[in-house]
């Protein structure tokens, strides 16, 4: 029974993160506490 070729590391669930501009977020977050 041939073994299936798979990556050694287990499957990892990727978190979906909305695209946010770091510059804008930092400025807004700092100003609006």
UniProtKB/Swiss-Prot annotation:
GO terms for biological process: cell differentiation; chromosome condensation; spermatogenesis. One of its GO terms (cellular component) is nucleus. Coiled coil: none annotated. Protamines substitute for histones in the chromatin of sperm during the haploid phase of spermatogenesis. They compact sperm DNA into a highly condensed, stable and inactive complex. One of its GO terms (molecular function) is DNA binding. Testis. This is Protamine TP14. The keyword Nucleus applies. The lineage of its organism: Eukaryota, Metazoa, Chordata, Craniata, Vertebrata. The keyword tRNA-binding does not apply. It is found in: Nucleus; Chromosome. Keywords: Chromosome, Developmental protein, Differentiation, DNA condensation, DNA-binding, Nucleosome core, Nucleus, Spermatogenesis. Residues 1-33 are annotated as: Disordered.
